Each structure stands twice: as C-alpha cells, then as structure tokens.
C-alpha cells in the first residue's frame, strides 16, 4: 500500500476516533451533561471540578488511551520498516488527527475538549519516562497553584520539546506536526489565557489542606 494511502487512512480513522468525547460519555452516565456544568468545557479538568477526582482520572485515562491506541497502530503501519520505531511520521499524523477530532468533533458541532489528555497519550508512546516526569511536575504545580491551563502546558510541552530536540532536524515533517499539535492546544486554551491575564481564571482545587477559620 502506498504511503499516501496509509496516511489518508490514518487521518480519517484517527479524526473519527478523536470525536469520541469521554467527558461527555461519563457525564451522561452520571445523568448530566458536562457542557452545561462548570466551565462548560467537555474535558478532564471540568470533569474533575464537576464530578470529582476519581471520575476525572477515569476521563484522563480514557482520552489518553483513545489517542494512544490508533497512534500506536498507525506508527507501525506507516513506518518504512514496521520495526523501525525511530520513524514517527505515522505516530504524529495520527496524534494530530486525534487531537483535531477531539477539539473540533464533527458529531458535536465542532465544539470539543482541549486535547491535553490526548497529547499526553501520544507523548507516552514517544517518550514515556519524560512524559511521566512532566506529568508529575504539572500535577504538583496544579495542586499548589491550582491553575489547570498552566499545569496542562507543563505536562504537554516538556515531552514534546524534548522530542523535537532529540530529532535534531532529522524528521522535519514530524517536527512540524509536533508544532501544529502544540499550537492547537494553546489556541484551545485561548479563553483560559484571557481569564488568566485578567485574574478571573477558574481554579482547580484537587486537595484542601487544613480547615477554614471557624470550622470545627
């Protein structure tokens, strides 16, 4: 099969998989609609705020898994040598397509989540150790500072910058796909950044330490 045919299949299938919004699915299971709760965003952070940490973790894992499964398959399919894991074109074509499908889902009138969990799933395939460290640092930042958008950027930018540097210009198409994926994630957080700079950003409180004054 010609490479362009493989890539076309990769884009279409991955985009459609990206349309599956687990935040919305989980909220339906809870007899609600995440789009009408909290910030209105059908994504992990809003699930945490609305339904709690356990459901939020489930949402994160499902969205990461949703991106990782097709990316792994198409990474293998599109490689010149199926056992050459350094050829990452299929991985990132699939990854970007899933993210586009997640942010702009045709079945939800192009109003989806922000793609962070999906990008984490892709990054775990490419550089699991670096991604886990970045996730841990971002999680600590979230617990302390409580700003979800910035914590998310820590989680996704660190492993992808590492990937771009490690490629060293050997796969310019892959570097371009990584740049496009990061740009989409930032643009998806436009409203968060506006609120952040105006001092009105929603806080995500994972843990409450101590008790308020007057509480027994």
Language model region names:
Residues 5-29:
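N-terminal signal-anchor transmembrane alpha helix
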Residues 6, 55-61, 65-106, 126-130, ...:
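Nucleotide and nucleotide-moiety/phosphate-recognizing core
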Residues 14-17, 97-102, 138-142, 159, ...:
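Alpha-helical transmembrane segments of multi-pass membrane proteins
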Residues 24-55, 194-216:
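Cytosolic, membrane-interface loops and tails of multi-pass inner-membrane proteins
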């Amino acid at each position: 099969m010609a490479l362009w045919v493989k890539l076309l299949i990769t884009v279409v299938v991955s985009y459609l998989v990206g349309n599956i919004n687990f935040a919305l699915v989980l909220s339906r299971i809870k007899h609600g609609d995440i789009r009408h709760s909290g910030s209105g965003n059908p994504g992990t952070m809003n699930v945490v705020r609305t339904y709690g940490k356990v459901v939020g973790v489930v949402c994160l894992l499902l969205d990461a898994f949703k991106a990782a499964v097709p990316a792994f398959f198409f990474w293998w399919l599109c490689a010149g040598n199926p056992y050459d894991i350094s050829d990452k074109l299929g991985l990132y074509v699939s990854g970007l397509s899933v993210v586009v499908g997640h942010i702009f889902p045709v079945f939800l009138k192009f109003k989806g989540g922000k793609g962070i969990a999906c990008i984490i799933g892709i990054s775990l395939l490419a550089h699991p150790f670096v991604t886990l460290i970045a996730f841990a640092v971002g999680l600590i930042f979230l617990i302390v500072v409580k700003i979800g958008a910035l914590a998310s950027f820590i989680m996704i930018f660190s492993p992808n910058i590492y990937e771009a540097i490690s490629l060293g210009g050997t796969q310019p198409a892959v570097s371009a796909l990584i740049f496009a994926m990061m740009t989409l994630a930032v643009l998806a957080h436009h409203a968060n950044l506006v609120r952040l700079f105006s001092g009105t950003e929603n806080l995500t409180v994972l843990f409450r330490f101590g008790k308020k004054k007057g509480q027994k």
